[in-house]
């Protein structure tokens, strides 16, 4: 591999410099994994028992147990969606624990957004006029209790969060789930050896899991963090790789859980720790936002202390960034925390610290987070980072003088506030044709779809060129940010109509909604538009794209989106094509049930055609 295939030049240079230092990154490991297993790519492999591995071919259409391609593919998919759902539920669980501690007055967490607390309490059926702390305890306990219900007890949380028209669909299909953890455990049970061999039942279970991924996981994590730390506020920032300065104690965070990292940002501003850092030869202590947590925090950067520099790196940029020598410590609390960080850190003498054992990297020091001791643990971590800074003196540090202007902090509330209090102005722009429609470009990045971030940037530019407004959330935001697409000046790249809209409002044609958790916020915008028009989500000229999905959480995201009635473009093609049944259900038949479906398409230009076609068909049906 002569050159690193990456959309952002600085990342490409980081990888090349890492190679010269003898440091491997995902970009250099990826080519070594070819050729890929064709059975794995199609999903027709099974390793569930000692008779395996079994693979399905024309000559051997059954596994030893008799499992068909349909069964094996559906089973693998259900397991993946269950795992992805469990990840999001874990994040919501810890956020609820933080809120519970705030309500009980135990630890350092506070209720900073009583308005959002009362909004959520009312939605869940509580008397919103109660004392805020009492309300916080009741809301947190309700959410946690709902998570822990068995599958045979219906979730109360999901129906209370569902839009009315979607709830009718879910009731008709009988896919309203039981408790989140019960659904996840039973999905693992029924996909074990010689148990469920009904592919349709397994796919229906995916739909139930998707509702928990979206409502219990994504939406609850967003809203609980809003209560604890403030809702996203539209803000203009200027940051980039230049924010990672060689003379600072730089602590990079990886994960999804704002609740676990907020105390770190606050501790980095404490005078005694700043004094300690200066005595070690540093100028300041800075928290470097990476992966989804960095984005989630940047949406609230208006509420955060100056120690947080902003969102700098997505999943596949973390190892190259550590390889620059600029990072003194990495604090992991969830994915995307790449295992290769161990090997990079060994070369750069970077300190690895884990605060949630879900992201326990080999070689990391484990300092467990608990809501009650979060402040003390944060101080301990910063002291270790300062010590690492001292020990790393003389280490080569490759500084990048890159800075971009970005509009951040867009959310379902801040967008409506910007529009004057309702979504009507957006509806009018869509109805007039100034904006053809809206596409949520969301999710991960990968190396398999045209290289690191390439399809994300190409597809997004192609969509805005066609007067389609893009709402972005997830690791996609790193290349979109570094490519300048969150800068209002990028309106010049949009089609004439969208350009005019953006210039008149002073906004970019790509709106940064933050983390992959914010997929729920994008969905809430669609809900608001649908309710204003009195229609259901599948009727709207909106769609979604996961142009470089990577992991099981992305499959849970896609399932949630299909539940909600979105047409969802995905690349690469999921590992399901070995089953004609599963492929047909996901790309065709499910549309007749929920109104949503998947469109697999690896070519970004063809994907843009398909998404535009979807939007134009919806416009035609609405008569606009």
From Swiss-Prot:
Binding site for [Ni-4Fe-5S] cluster: 256, 292, 336, 444, 475, 516
Gene Ontology MF term list: 4 iron, 4 sulfur cluster binding; anaerobic carbon-monoxide dehydrogenase activity; hydroxylamine reductase activity; nickel cation binding; peroxidase activity
InterPro entries: CO_DH_a-bundle (IPR016101), CODH (IPR010047), HCP/CODH (IPR004137), Prismane-like_a/b-sand (IPR016099), Prismane-like_sf (IPR011254)
Entry EC number(s): 1.2.7.4
Alphabetic keyword roster: 4Fe-4S, Iron, Iron-sulfur, Metal-binding, Nickel, Oxidoreductase
Subunit comment: Homodimer.
Reported function: CODH oxidizes carbon monoxide coupled, via CooF, to the reduction of a hydrogen cation by a hydrogenase (possibly CooH).
Domain remark in the UniProt entry: Cluster B is an all-cysteinyl-liganded 4Fe-4S cluster; cluster C is a mixed Ni-Fe-S cluster is to be the active site of CO oxidation. Cluster D is also an all-cysteinyl-liganded 4Fe-4S cluster that bridges the two subunits of the CODH dimer.
Family: Belongs to the Ni-containing carbon monoxide dehydrogenase family.
Protein's name in the database: Carbon monoxide dehydrogenase
Taxonomic source organism: Methanocaldococcus jannaschii (strain ATCC 43067 / DSM 2661 / JAL-1 / JCM 10045 / NBRC 100440) (Methanococcus jannaschii)
């Amino acid at each position: 591999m002569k050159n690193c295939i990456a959309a952002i030049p600085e990342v490409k240079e980081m990888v090349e410099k890492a190679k010269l230092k003898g440091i491997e990154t995902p970009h250099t490991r990826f080519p070594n994994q070819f050729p890929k297993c064709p059975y794995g790519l199609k999903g027709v492999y099974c390793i569930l028992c000692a008779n395996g591995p079994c693979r399905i071919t024309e000559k051997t259409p059954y596994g030893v147990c008799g499992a068909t391609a349909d069964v094996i593919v559906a089973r693998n998919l259900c397991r993946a969606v269950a795992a992805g759902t469990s990840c999001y539920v874990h994040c919501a669980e810890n956020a609820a624990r933080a809120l519970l501690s705030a309500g009980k007055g135990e630890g350092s967490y506070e209720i900073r957004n009583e308005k959002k607390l009362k909004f959520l309490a009312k939605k869940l059926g509580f008397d919103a006029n109660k004392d805020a702390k009492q309300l916080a305890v009741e809301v947190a306990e309700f959410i946690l209790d709902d998570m822990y219900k068995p599958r045979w007890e219906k979730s109360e949380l999901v129906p209370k969060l569902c839009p009315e028209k979607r709830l009718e669909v879910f009731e008709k299909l009988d896919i309203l789930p039981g408790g989140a953890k019960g659904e996840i455990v039973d999905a693992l049970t029924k996909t074990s050896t010689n148990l469920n061999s009904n592919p349709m039942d397994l796919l229906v279970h995916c739909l139930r899991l998707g509702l928990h991924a979206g409502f219990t996981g994504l939406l609850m994590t967003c809203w609980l963090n809003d209560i604890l730390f403030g809702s996203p506020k539209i803000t203009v920032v200027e940051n980039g790789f230049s924010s990672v300065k060689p003379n600072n104690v730089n602590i990079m965070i990886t994960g999804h859980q704002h609740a676990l990292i907020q105390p770190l940002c606050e501790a980095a501003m404490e005078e005694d720790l700043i004094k300690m850092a200066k005595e070690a030869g540093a100028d300041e202590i800075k928290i470097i936002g990476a992966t989804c947590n960095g984005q989630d925090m940047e949406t609230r950067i208006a509420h955060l202390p100056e120690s947080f520099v902003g969102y700098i790196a997505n999943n596949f940029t973390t190892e190259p960034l550590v390889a620059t020598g600029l990072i003194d410590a990495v604090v992991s609390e969830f994915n995307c925390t790449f295992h290769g960080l161990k090997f990079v850190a060994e070369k750069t003498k970077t300190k690895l610290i884990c605060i949630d054992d879900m992201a326990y990297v080999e070689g990391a020091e484990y300092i467990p987070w608990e809501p009650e001791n979060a402040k003390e643990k944060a101080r301990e971590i910063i002291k270790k980072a300062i010590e690492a800074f001292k020990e790393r003196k003389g280490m080569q540090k490759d500084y990048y003088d890159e800075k971009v202007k970005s509009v951040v902090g867009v959310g379902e509330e801040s967008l409506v506030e910007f529009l004057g209090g309702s979504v009507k102005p957006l509806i009018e722009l869509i109805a007039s044709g100034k904006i053809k429609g809206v596409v949520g470009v969301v999710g991960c990045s990968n190396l398999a779809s045209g290289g690191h971030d390439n399809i994300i940037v190409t597809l997004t530019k192609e969509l805005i060129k066609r007067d389609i407004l893009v709402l972005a959330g997830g690791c996609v935001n790193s290349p979109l940010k570094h490519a300048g697409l969150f800068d209002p000046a990028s309106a010049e790249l949009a089609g004439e109509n969208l350009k005019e809209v953006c210039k008149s409002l002073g906004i970019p044609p790509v709106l940064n909604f933050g983390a992959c958790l914010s997929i729920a916020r994008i969905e809430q915008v669609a809900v608001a538009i649908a309710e204003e028009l009195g229609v259901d989500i599948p009727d709207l000229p909106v769609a979604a794209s996961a142009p470089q999905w990577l992991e099981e959480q992305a499959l849970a995201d896609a399932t949630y989106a299909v539940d909600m009635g979105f047409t969802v473009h995905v690349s690469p093609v999921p590992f399901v094509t070995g089953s004609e049944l599963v492929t047909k259900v996901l790309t065709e038949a499910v549309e007749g049930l929920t109104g949503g479906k998947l469109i697999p398409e690896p070519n970004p230009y063809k994907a843009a055609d398909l998404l535009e076609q979807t939007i134009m068909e919806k416009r035609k049906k609405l008569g606009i």
